[in-house]
Swiss-Prot record:
UniProt xrefs under PROSITE patterns: WD_REPEATS_1 (PS00678), WD_REPEATS_2 (PS50082), WD_REPEATS_REGION (PS50294)
Record-stated family: Belongs to the WD repeat MORG1 family.
This protein's record includes keyword Cytoplasm: yes
Name used for this protein in its record: Uncharacterized WD repeat-containing protein C713.05
Species for this entry: Schizosaccharomyces pombe (strain 972 / ATCC 24843) (Fission yeast)
Gene3D superfamilies: YVTN repeat-like/Quinoprotein amine dehydrogenase (2.130.10.10)
WD repeat ranges, renumbered to this chain: 12-51, 54-93, 96-135, 140-177, 179-217, 222-261, 265-297
Amino acid sequence: MRLEAKTKLSSKAKEPINVVKYNRTGKYVLAAGNERVVRLWNVKSGACIHEYAGHGHEILDLDLVYDSTKFASCGGDKFIQVWDVNTGKVDRRLGGHLAQINTIRYNEDSSILASGSFDSKVRLWDCRSNSFSPIQVLADAKDSVSSIDIAEHLIVTGSTDGTLRTYDIRKGTLSSDYFSHPITSVKTSKSASFSLISSLNSSIHLLDQETGKILKSYIGLKNMEYRVRSSFNQSETIVFSGSEDGKVYLWDLENETQITSTSVVGTPIVTDISCHPTMDDFIIATVHGDLFIYQYN
């Protein structure tokens, strides 16, 4: 497999970008980081078409609603801000966490927003309500909640206490799977049957959500200190990850073999990665504020 660098987006950022995401159509990209601004790009033209400024501290995560008309962002100022994409205005500002908010995620129909914080709590927000209070607080983590994903009826959370917690909304149950190192990234499959878990021991594991068994492991990257996210491609056959050695790594999901890796020019750390929803493209963010789109074939 060959990786081809297609585009470098003019990010304007001089500081680390902590999160980058394609929207559901893949026509637009949102990214944010330590500069406290969310930027929106048109992928085809490569132009930055809007900037959303309003956070008082670094932005650590963001997520879009299903139809891409709104997005939520969070970070060091302990607030979630829900933005109208077209007007650039903040529709809602949600507080309650006692420390920085590391991660946020909408469910499939964007009716629920989950937020995870350094305060070890997960808060669930009803997006159909005008309430500024969470509908539920999940207080099971013993340390910072670093990552959340939602698929089908499962809310899956990773914590620096080394535990993956899976909340089954239908059954009202909690299952816990312990990893020996802090968890930094969680990505659950569309069917909610397995999850991709990154942790601070330079390894990524594929976990069976039903049994809690580790099905596959992916090694070769460097991840010992920072949050470095991993993901699947759109067909969930390839595992992608950034790395603290300035590279992007790809593995075959089934046989665990490393397909390829490539060094990203000008950066020591690749912080985040987002795969295009329909094409064989992915975008990466770096600690030096760069955004690169790659094609794999």
